[in-house]
Amino acid sequence: INYVPVMLTFPTELTRSFERKNKESLSNISQSVKLPDQTPEKGEESVQKTFTEEWGGLKDDELTFVYNDEELLLLHRDIWLQMTEEERRSKKSVLDVGCGYGKEAIVLTKIFPEAFVVGADMNLAVIEAGERLVREKNVNPVVASLFHLPFADNGFDHVHCQGVIHHTFSTYEGFKAISRKVDLLKGTLFVWVYAKEDRYMVPGIRGFCVWLYWAVSHSIFRPILSRSPSFIRSFFVHLISILMHPVIMFRGRNKGKWKYANTVHGIRDAFTPMYAHEHGFNEFLGWFEETGFNPVLQRSAHYKEIFGSRLVGVGANGYRKDETIIPSGSLN
């Protein structure tokens, strides 16, 4: 649909509508053509709805969260991946798990210039972006669940997943599912998730506000809003956004580019997903080791040099255990 394969294993209103509109054509192709009929993973229908609303509202904005396009490239290439140019050019196939509206997949084509990049996401807003994305060199969008990706195991030179698996029913199960898509010999796996330590590391009143945000969002907003009808969810999101936007729009590096849509996007991400799990550093790093990777942690000090603020969350780029690891930041 709009150049985007929809490879979900469970039915949605989109696929039902497609079947109704094309019933005669489908029957001419084969009598066995039917809707996907499996049961979605726990919470997936809610996750799909809330993230479709989130990315459909922002669309192709010049900012992705707090980052402009140039900053997004620096973040992924220099802070998180830390690969040499030779390493990056050696990658021929890249899977971006949770591509949002597609901008992250475009960034990955710049980092991996020789690679065929597949941008997979369960949110249906990626379909709206389809025609634009397929015009980009080497970008290939697909709608799919990360638990049922329509690709062979061990098929990608690099799998990239930033801020996604902690929004599933089980971050650990999500990690295992995407790790199976990494090439067994020289494949790499990058993952970033919310860090449990963050809510305890900020001192003073600001630290209390961080702790309060997590407590309120997890105990009140997420359980209620993720299960509410869309119009109720949107009402509260816009109510909070109207109150917060006058404060947020004048903060940060890109305050001149910050729009109301950016505030709404941030509020939706903060309060509407059903799941937003936090994980400790040691727990997270252990997952890499269990699945056959040596993890290289993100560059926190370098992040502060570039962006002037503290890096949150925990990210690591995992190498297969028999590979020699030489992060590019260590080279002269």
Tell me what each language-model feature is.
Residues H160:
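A conserved beta-strand element that flanks and buttresses the S-adenosyl-L-methionine
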Residues T188-I224:
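Conserved class I S-adenosyl-L-methionine
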Residues I1-P150, A276-H277, E283, R299-L331:
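Conserved N-terminal segment of class I S-adenosyl-L-methionine
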Residues Y172-K186:
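A short glycine-rich, Lys/Arg-flanked "PGG" loop and its adjoining helix->strand segment in the class I
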Residues K103-I106, T168-E173:
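Short N-terminal helix/helix-N-cap motif within the alpha/beta-hydrolase-1
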Residues K91, F156-D157:
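Local beta-strand N-terminus motif with an aromatic residue
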Residues G163-V164:
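Short catalytic micro-motifs in class I SAM-dependent methyltransferases
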Residues W214-T291:
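Substrate-binding/catalytic lobe of Class I Rossmann-like enzymes that use SAM or dcSAM, i.e.
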